[in-house]
Regions:
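Short Gly/Thr/Asp-enriched flexible loops that form oxyanion-binding sites at enzyme active sites
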Residues: 76-89, 94
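Short, structured active-site "lid" loops
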Residues: 48-66
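A short beta-strand-loop structural module common to alpha/beta enzyme folds
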Residues: 28-45
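A short, small-residue-rich loop immediately preceding and capping a beta-strand
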Residues: 64-70, 89
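A short, Lys/Arg-enriched amphipathic alpha-helix followed by its capping loop at the start of a domain
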Residues: 17-30
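C-terminal binding/interaction regions
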Residues: 3-19, 98-123
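Generic N-terminal amphipathic, Lys/Arg-enriched alpha-helix
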Residues: 1-8, 32-37
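Catalytic alpha/beta core domains of metabolic enzymes, predominantly
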Residues: 56, 70-71, 93-97
Length: 123
């Protein structure tokens, strides 16, 4: 089972992330559980730390085998997740990162930069 967790700065992208992730992994036999945030208007606003706690609880309990999370840069989500037990989270911004992280580090969580290249000319 794959858990999707979004923090508040990127909550508005949850639907797109869930749809794309599910579309790729479900044909391979994986199930994606969406733990939110579901939109920027959610009553409960999840912070990096809360996402890290949730990732740790899901992985430690066996409710999830893998967690996909992220934030604007992916760095804050990665640091928060790695602060809690039983989470080995890598920063993944491209397919090569994902492959090497899985092969070399045997992690159980990835943090993605959901706002990367979103400001175009400013980069």
């Amino acid at each position: 089972r794959i858990a999707l967790i979004n923090e508040n700065s990127q909550a508005g992208k949850n639907g797109v992330i869930y749809r794309e992730l599910s579309g790729v992994v479900e044909p391979m036999g994986h199930v994606v559980d969406n733990y939110g945030m579901y939109s920027a208007d959610d009553e409960a606003q999840l912070t990096y730390v809360q996402c890290g706690i949730l990732a740790s609880l899901l992985l430690s309990s066996g409710a999830a085998d893998f967690v996909v999370t992220g934030c604007g840069t992916g760095q804050g989500a990665m640091i928060a997740c790695n602060s809690f037990p039983n989470v080995v989270c890598g920063h993944v911004s491209n397919p090569s990162d994902a492959f090497l992280f899985a092969q070399v580090n045997d992690g159980n969580c990835v943090a993605m930069p959901y706002a990367q290249n979103m400001d175009g000319a400013v980069n």
